[in-house]
């Protein structure tokens, strides 16, 4: 019974069933997010014989307008397809193999990040689900698996067996115990991993611990509609991030040695410190993600009045080439994107809220200190400290060249609209630039917007270490005290 209920709970996702009333209505969302409760309820609910709403789970009832016809419509979606035959291999606990054919048969998972689904406890202690539209680039698409063996994993202990033996892996409502990494480093070439339900983690007070690690070739990592990956950040947040305080996982989702692959349509919330570390990848595309660390904006008992989350970078990118990050929404408390090394990198269609903007750096003092060919384009930076920033570490060496910011809209920026600093230290800038890191061929095109405070432009270069900066269609207003020691003509 448990097995068939689990398979049934994914039918509206696999077959793309939409709410008959209106797409995006909270009734559809609650059936996706509360899939177990919905499946159990729908198994006995019949609109023709049940017209009262007594006994209906409050989470389903309140989000379906207290109307049995809406409940019935959503239940009909759950039952529109036949449940496939499921074989449970005795050698792999909690892994359900749903196909194992000699000729691979493709399958489709409908995915979307058009809405953020907030789950909160109502006064009655039932789960209330509210779908809140946000200014996030819509990334709704269909993912087609590669056929072969498809496995559904419901227990952490079964992940390693599935990684070794399955072409397509559906991770359903996984709880990773303390000190237990979701290790996806041994994936088969061409494998697909699909997150479903809510993925959660036990407490692990260790800065060297990585909750999720993935690598592979021609791999796809994605999520079905309504899934949530929750990093348990509130257990660690103390206002200090990686700068001090208690030990906490430094990078939540580590992507390394990944080639010709895609990561798409994931919803991640409440990561402890940095979210993604992208390292040593080639021809990797990351698309349509929602990173929501908004809960970390509030102070807690450990943060001394400051936001509880700190150093919560969305994406840290290093030693990677031909990397694309696109159509992604980030609400955090540090760099939205930070490129510290790599070549041929495109960051396009970003919505960055609450953090430190679109950054190159900091550069210097690392194993690789070269950034060549990075384009940030068609993006918004909102209610953040900085808009477009290049930062190099004081007293270190390296090189930054061929950087382009194009069609970037800024709003409510508090510190710097455009910021190039060669005096950077994590504890604070020195005010004295050094010239060990060269910065050349930097272009700002159609970078526009407004400041709430701070400086529209701040450029502090070392002696002869900056060259060939171009400003075209740049207009940032609302700040004061602009200061640019390069170019010789002054600030834009």
Swiss-Prot record:
It catalyses: (1,4-alpha-D-galacturonosyl)n+m + H2O = (1,4-alpha-D-galacturonosyl)n + (1,4-alpha-D-galacturonosyl)m. Its EC number is 3.2.1.15. Glycans are attached at residues 292, 407, 441. Keywords: Cell wall biogenesis/degradation, Disulfide bond, Glycoprotein, Glycosidase, Hydrolase, Repeat, Secreted, Signal. It is an enzyme of class 3 (hydrolase). The keyword Secreted applies. One of its GO terms (molecular function) is polygalacturonase activity. The active site is at 334 (proton donor), 356. Disulfide bonds join 151-166, 336-352, 461-466, 484-491. The keyword Protein biosynthesis does not apply. This is Probable endopolygalacturonase D. The gene is pgaD.
């Amino acid at each position: 019974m448990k097995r068939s209920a689990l398979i049934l709970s994914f039918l509206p996702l696999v077959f793309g069933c939409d709410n008959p009333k209106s797409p995006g209505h909270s009734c559809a969302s609650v059936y996706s997010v509360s899939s177990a409760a919905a499946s159990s309820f729908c198994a006995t609910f019949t609109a023709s014989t049940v017209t009262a709403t007594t006994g209906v789970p409050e989470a389903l009832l309140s989000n379906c307008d207290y109307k049995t016809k809406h409940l019935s419509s959503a239940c009909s979606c759950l039952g529109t397809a036949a449940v496939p035959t499921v074989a449970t291999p005795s050698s792999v606990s909690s892994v359900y193999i749903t196909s194992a054919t000699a000729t691979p048969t493709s399958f489709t998972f409908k995915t979307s990040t058009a809405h953020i689904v907030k789950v909160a406890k109502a006064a009655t202690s039932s789960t209330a689900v509210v779908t809140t539209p946000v200014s996030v680039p819509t990334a709704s698409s269909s993912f087609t698996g590669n056929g072969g063996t498809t496995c559904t994993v419901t227990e952490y202990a079964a992940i390693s067996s599935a990684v070794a033996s399955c072409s397509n892996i559906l991770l359903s409502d996984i709880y990773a115990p303390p000190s237990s990494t979701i290790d996806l480093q041994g994936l088969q070439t061409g494998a697909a991993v699909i997150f479903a339900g809510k993925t959660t983690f036990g407490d692990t007070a260790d800065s060297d611990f990585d909750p999720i690690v993935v690598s592979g070739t021609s791999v796809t990592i994605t999520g079905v509609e309504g899934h949530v990956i929750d990093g348990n950040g509130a257990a660690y947040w103390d206002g200090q991030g990686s700068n001090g305080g208690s030990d906490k996982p430094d990078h939540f989702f580590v992507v390394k040695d990944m080639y010709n692959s895609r990561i798409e349509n994931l919803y991640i919330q409440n990561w402890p410190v940095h979210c993604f570390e992208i390292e040593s990848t080639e021809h990797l595309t990351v698309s349509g993600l929602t990173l929501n660390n908004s809960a970390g904006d509030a102070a807690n008992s450990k943060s001394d009045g400051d936001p509880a989350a700190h150093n919560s970078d969305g994406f840290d990118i290093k030693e990677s080439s031909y990397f694309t990050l696109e159509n992604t929404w980030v609400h955090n408390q540090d760099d939205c994107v930070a490129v510290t090394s790599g070549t041929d990198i495109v960051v396009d269609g970003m919505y960055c809220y609450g953090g430190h903007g679109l950054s190159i750096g900091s550069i210097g003092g690392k194993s690789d200190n070269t950034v060549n060919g990075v384009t940030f384009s068609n993006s918004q930076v909102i209610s953040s400290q900085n808009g477009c920033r290049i930062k190099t570490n004081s007293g270190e060496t390296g090189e930054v060249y061929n950087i382009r910011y194009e069609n970037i809209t800024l709003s409510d920026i508090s510190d710097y609209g455009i910021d190039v600093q060669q005096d950077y230290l994590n504890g604070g800038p020195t005010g004295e630039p050094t010239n060990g890191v060269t910065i050349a061929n930097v272009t700002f095109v159609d970078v526009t917007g407004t400041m709430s405070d701070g400086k529209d432009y701040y450029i502090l270069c070392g002696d002869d270490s900056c060259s060939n900066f171009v400003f075209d269609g740049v207009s940032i207003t609302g700040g004061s005290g602009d200061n640019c020691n390069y170019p010789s003509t002054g600030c834009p």
